[in-house]
Amino acid sequence: MVPLVEIKDIHKSFGDLEVLKGVNFSVNEGEVVCLVGRSGSGKSTLLRCINLLEKPDAGTIRVFGEDILHTRDVNAYRAKVGMCFQQFNLFNNMNVLRNCVYPQQKVLKKSREEAEKTAYQYLDHVGMREFAGQSVKTISGGQKQRVAIARALCMNPRLMLFDEPTSALDPEMVGEVLNVMRDLAKEGLTMIIVTHEMGFAREVADRVVFMDQGKIEEEGTPEQIFEHPKSERTASFLRASVNK
């Protein structure tokens, strides 16, 4: 099986700070991979490299069989890769429905009628259809993140990237977003998720990847990582996470 995502020897620095130090990993179609690790370990930078929001200094990234670092059409590539950020990145001057419709019209060249039909379908999927006419300024953080997920799904992505999607939410709103992501995992959507939600990673991930100091320290099934970590750094991180 050819991996959907294949990353080889990725390096990335910001000035004198080397953030990624030769990262290698792959993701198969339909797989859910959770990236975990301390803040500053390189998780989010790796995710941003996959979506070409950052360009690596060295190495190769192949997604859908394509060398994306030399793609001629970044927008066409990004249309196939959904991404949800910590801070939602919604259009605050638009209502909920328009947030989901506009990208379809702009990138996929859909008619308004077709785009609205798709938007309602995915807003319904994340439990936000009744808020379609509301300004995004008036809804909660958890609701904003669900709209952001719906917006990404409207583009019919083959791959979804989540960069700590619950970190900016109040604790009582975390569950509603994780429930949507659980449903997506059950539907077989390929997902790479940067998360500090260890219980969620343990429950949903097919594979957990622990990053430390810009490298992959250890990876395995949730049972292998959480029950039988081989690395002392992994074990130390997990102990600290449980004791928070």
Positions of PLM-derived features:
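Helix-to-loop junction immediately C-terminal to a conserved catalytic motif
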Residues: N51
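Conserved ABC transporter NBD signature motif
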Residues: G59-L69
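ABC ATPase NBD coupling module
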Residues: I68-G82, R112-E113, I225-P229
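Conserved ABC ATPase "signature" region
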Residues: V101, R112-F131, N179
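The feature captures the beta-strand-to-loop junction immediately N-terminal to the Walker
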Residues: V36-R38
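Conserved ABC ATPase signature
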Residues: S135-I139, Q143
